[in-house]
């Protein structure tokens, strides 16, 4: 291919790419005309083409209930974030671009008020029931107790519980069973799985906390730590006096202000009642039976 024809071809490809982006981007932000499904097309149950990032879960052998996310009106969910199923998003929570709260396996998932899920955060959980049988140690009570399947509190427990004023920094994975106490900071690219973090804990970047351990209140997990035994957790230093002593206060403040500010822009979703009306009007009739 000569140079002239090559330039012509690349120009055509560039124009086509721009046209595609101009079509996709406005709809991702709830702008422009939202196309209606053609005959034979399927739309996810209790989702909408205007807010495809927020929708209910599906029925499985480990989850017999269909649940829509519960989102407080003052929370901000970015259009490029995803919230599915049995997720509770509390007051003034910021859910940043590419963050995911996926309550379709282990449930429920709880994000307390004034907390933040920064870019790339994932919250998910292992199944908590199978064929309506409760699984031991797969849920936590709101006070941090780990629950057996026959515990009377199991039905009110959580696969993942994130308290209030908690910061989950960029790329954090919280995978249930997991518990994160109030005023706790979890640093970038860290993993918390099958573990409990107490109140006022600071976790340094790129740390791993797993193996059923419990990190006590006011502890500091140094960057890059791998905590897999209770002995390692008990030996952790105090947060006060560490480089992370006051980090969470500043991070919570920043993200609370961001949630407020973005909530005033057109990116913000409407009220829960408005969202439900659009979702009900736009979805196809779908069976709720397995």
Language-model regions, residue ranges each:
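Sec-dependent N-terminal signal peptides
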Residues: 7-22
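Extended, small-residue-rich solenoid/repeat segments and analogous flexible loops
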Residues: 34-92, 100
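Small cofactor-carrier domains centered on a conserved lysine used for covalent cofactor attachment
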Residues: 96
């Amino acid at each position: 291919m000569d140079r002239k024809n090559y330039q012509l071809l690349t120009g055509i490809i560039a124009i086509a790419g721009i046209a595609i982006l101009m079509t996709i981007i406005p709809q991702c932000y709830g702008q422009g005309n939202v196309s209606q499904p053609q005959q034979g097309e399927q739309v996810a149950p209790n989702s909408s083409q205007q807010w495809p990032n927020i929708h209910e879960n599906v029925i499985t052998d480990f989850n017999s209930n269909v649940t829509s996310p519960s989102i407080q009106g003052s929370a901000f969910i970015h259009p490029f974030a995803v919230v599915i199923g049995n997720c509770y998003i509390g007051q003034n929570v910021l859910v940043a671009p590419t963050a995911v709260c996926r309550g379709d396996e282990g449930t429920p998932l709880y994000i307390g008020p004034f907390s933040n899920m920064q870019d790339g955060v994932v919250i998910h959980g292992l199944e908590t029931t199978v064929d309506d049988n409760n699984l031991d140690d797969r849920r936590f009570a709101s006070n941090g107790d780990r629950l057996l399947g026959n515990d009377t509190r199991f039905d009110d427990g959580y696969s993942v519980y994130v308290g209030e004023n908690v910061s989950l920094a960029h790329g954090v994975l919280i995978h249930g069973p997991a518990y994160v106490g109030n005023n706790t900071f979890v640093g970038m690219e860290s993993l918390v799985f099958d573990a409990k973090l107490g109140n006022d804990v600071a976790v340094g970047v790129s740390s791993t906390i797993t193996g059923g351990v419990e990190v006590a209140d006011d502890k500091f997990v140094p960057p890059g730590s791998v905590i897999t035994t209770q002995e390692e957790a008990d030996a952790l230093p105090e947060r006060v006096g560490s480089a992370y002593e006051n980090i969470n206060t500043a991070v919570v403040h920043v993200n609370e202000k961001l949630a407020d500010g973005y909530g005033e822009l057109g990116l913000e979703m409407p009220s829960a009642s408005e969202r439900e009306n659009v979702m009900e009007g736009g979805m196809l009739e779908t069976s709720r039976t397995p």
